[in-house]
Amino acid sequence: MTRFVKSVLICLTLAFGGQSVATLPAAADIGDADRDALNKMFEAYIRANPEVVREALLALAKREADAALTAALRTLHDDSGDPFIGNPDASIVIYEFSDYNCGYCKRVFTPLQQLLAEDDDVKLVLKEFPILNQASILAAQAAVAAQAQGVFPDFHVAMMTARGAVTMDSIMAAAGEAGADLDRLQADMNSAKVAMIIERTRAAAQQLKISGTPGLVIGTQVIPGAVGIDEMRQIIAATRAENG
């Protein structure tokens, strides 16, 4: 078998899930003359129909992308301890990669709150993704710690509606407004569990190729940047239809 034909057959085999195109009669059952004839036939066909190779490579790329997305979503859905708002048993989950210093995150805050108010079958999980500065890290730690006390929704509203730069003082003010035990909150902020949850979010973002905020994931749709409520509604409707 020529190197050209062998390379093409390997591509086709990988692209179609390991079902080898070459599972013709066993090699031992084919004589040299027949083998040469088959090689020439394959090579002539492939050269005359190069789109076959292209389609095979596209199929392979899609399979690899689908597998990568499945693995990334598995990491994303591991959300124990992540802050959330809404019905804990909702069938639709919106994951938001967010940073409290992100202006675009504040822009998407209002439509998300409106969506939660109008649809009680939606849950918003905040994937705390502090990427802008040290204060972002402190705010993310406080958000996860606020979730542990059951006061995250009010903390989140206070943080998103506050004016001015995020500082430790503004974080503690938001936590106090939400009714948090501040001593416990500060202790939890530095805990290994909170660090693990934030690191888990970083891993999910890397797998999903999310490098900025906000980043939304609804079903299998990854949406970079801020989007309006109408687009969110459309994606949710499509996700519900897909889920049956």
Spans of model-derived segments:
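N-terminal targeting signals for export/organelle localization
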Residues: 2-6, 10-74
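A short beta-strand-turn-helix
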Residues: 75-92, 116-117
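Beta-strand elements within well-structured catalytic alpha/beta cores of enzymes
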Residues: 38, 93-94
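Short amphipathic alpha-helical/adjacent loop interface patches that line ligand
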Residues: 50, 109, 202
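C-terminal cap of thioredoxin/glutaredoxin-like
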Residues: 5-7, 24, 28-35, 39-45, ...
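Structural alpha/beta surface segment adjacent to cysteine/selenocysteine redox centers
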Residues: 95, 100-101, 106-176, 180-181, ...
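Residue-level signal for pocket-adjacent positions within structured domains
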Residues: 71, 79-80, 218
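Soluble non-cytosolic domains of exported or imported proteins
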Residues: 32-36, 47, 63, 103-106, ...
